Amino acid sequence: MQVAELIAPREFRLTEQDLDPPAAGEVQVEVHAVGICGSDLHAYHEGAVGDTPNQYPMVLGHEPAGRVVATGVGVTGWSPGDRVALEPALYCYHCEFCRSGRHNVCANIRFLSNPGVPGFFRRRVNLPATNLVGVPDSLALETATLVEPLAIALHSLKVGAIQKDETVLVLGGGPIGLLTVACLKLAGAARIWAVEPVPARREMARKMGADDVFDPHETDIVREVMAATGKRGVDCSIDCAAKEDTTNQAIRAARNAGRVLMTGIHSEVRVPFEISPMRRKELSILMVRRSNHESHDALQLLLDHGARIAPLVTHTRPLDRIADAFRIAGSYEDGVGKMVIC
């Protein structure tokens, strides 16, 4: 099968590799589509994701959809030809966190596309049957790649305990930020501010449901939010951009006893926070770690509200043009929202 390996920062190599038949309890899936995530771009450009350095060669990609081609011994409920989205995390199910339902912080988690665990920029993969989510014929597999990032957006709303009629500021209009805006709108947020420097993505934010959209290079975001809320601030700030300035804007824009939700992944290992307003306002600073079995809810959201969410997928490229795909996605060319490798 064809595999795209990252062998150095900004350098892919296409290889041919064999794949064993699926083991007991596993399903083999032919990968038809994989979205490029922001963390893939970090690994590609920077040689690391946060404090986790790349280990070359490595296979990125963790937003997959495809078709079942074979099943291992003991697998029931799946047959060749079934259309599926795939959860990319492998949990142990026996640590204290798994036993308490916090699978996303499993002590023994293995995440496909992390160093040492090949991801989905390849033609076939074996996975536990429990990692499959059935996709109906009515949903394009390219659109089904949104299940994984949409699950993260849904999980972030749970972590932030977002309530109907609350005010929310979303910093960053990449795919996760845009999906967060869509989820907030569908959850009944009273007013949503979105901040994004790329014009095409600001327009997408409006279509996803943002009430107010700003260019951070032209607008003092905190002043704008404070003026609109009578100097109160928002109930929750969500930092999907993960930059020093966006994190501190999120802190300054939050109301007293408000929440700051950090969904994005900072490139820097250490980021200076403005600690005084955090203490003075007694803010709750909340971190988001991927998702926690929200994939089925994400799929249902796509089926129910596809007209709003599906247009996020704007570009596709074949696997043998993966370098071109990463160049476009990383430079925000041509109005790119979500780039999908097919």
Region roles according to the model:
Residues M1-V3, N248-R252, N292-C342:
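C-terminal hydrophobic helical "lid"/dimerization subdomain
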Residues D20-V34, V49-E96, P136-S138:
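Glycine-rich beta-strand-centered segment in the early N-terminal region that forms part
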Residues C92-L171:
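NAD(P)H dinucleotide-binding glycine-rich loop of Rossmann-like/cofactor-binding domains
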Residues L139-E218, R223:
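Mid-domain Rossmann-like dinucleotide-binding core that forms the NAD(H)/NADP(H) cofactor-binding site
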Residues G160, E203-S284:
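Glycine-rich cofactor phosphate-binding loops and adjacent beta1-alpha1 units
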Residues V198, H266, S291:
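Residues in the short beta-alpha loop(s) of Rossmann-like NAD(P)-binding domains
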Residues R259-L261, F273-L312:
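Rossmann-fold dehydrogenase core element
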